[in-house]
């Protein structure tokens, strides 16, 4: 009988087998790592063991829903609302809030780790839908485009707040298969 508040219900997880595979894989990896640390240090405090096991479960859960994000439209079919919610969940719990895709176009950042286990995701979601945030963003325009196109598309005045978030100037500054190189940094 299902006693996990719907966690393993395919309406929620979409693919029980993949979820279990990710959890088991992460548990095995964590247990192997714990054994290695115990051998090196001669033991592991009980609290550390519990935190690592919790992290294995959370990481497995994260990895499953990262797969759902990566394979939405092919292996998985979810509504736009669920895709947005899943994206927010993945971005909130990925390591260092990094944004990176591999050469196949799949988001490949791992779970953030033990420190992320105590994040208050429900509190963040509640805040996003609060009246305070609604009032702040009700006249906000968010664009994802080249900054020159943005400046050519709007007539700004001194009361406008503009936030530009350029990619890092590094060797891995490829975002959604769009490069941002040294000459782009100079243009900016």
Where are these regions (language model features)?
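Class I S-adenosyl-L-methionine-dependent methyltransferase module
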Residues: 1-137
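Conserved proline-anchored active-site loop of SAM-dependent methyltransferases
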Residues: 1, 88, 92-95, 101, ...
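Adenosine-cofactor binding site in Rossmann-like domains, unifying the SAM/SAH pocket
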Residues: 132-148, 177-180
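SAM-dependent methyltransferase catalytic-core segment centered on the flexible catalytic loop
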Residues: 161, 169-188
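Amphipathic coiled-coil/heptad-repeat helices and related helical stalk/stem segments
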Residues: 126, 143-147, 184-188
């Amino acid at each position: 009988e299902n006693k996990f508040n719907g966690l393993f219900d395919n309406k929620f997880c979409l693919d029980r087998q993949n979820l279990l595979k990710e959890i088991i894989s992460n548990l095995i990896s964590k247990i192997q790592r714990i054994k290695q640390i115990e051998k090196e240090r001669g033991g592991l405090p009980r609290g550390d063991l519990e935190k690592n096991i919790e992290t294995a479960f959370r990481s497995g859960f994260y990895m499953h829903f990262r797969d759902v994000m990566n394979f939405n439209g092919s292996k998985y079919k979810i509504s736009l609302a669920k895709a947005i919610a899943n994206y927010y969940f993945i971005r909130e719990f990925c390591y260092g809030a990094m944004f990176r895709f591999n050469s196949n176009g799949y988001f490949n950042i791992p779970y953030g780790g033990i420190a992320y286990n105590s994040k208050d995701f429900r509190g963040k979601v509640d805040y996003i839908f609060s009246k305070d945030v609604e009032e702040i963003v009700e006249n906000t325009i968010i664009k994802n485009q080249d900054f020159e196109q943005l400046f050519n598309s709007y007539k700004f005045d001194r009361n406008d707040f503009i936030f530009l978030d350029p990619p890092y100037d590094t060797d891995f500054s490829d975002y959604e298969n769009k490069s941002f190189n040294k000459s782009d940094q100079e243009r900016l």
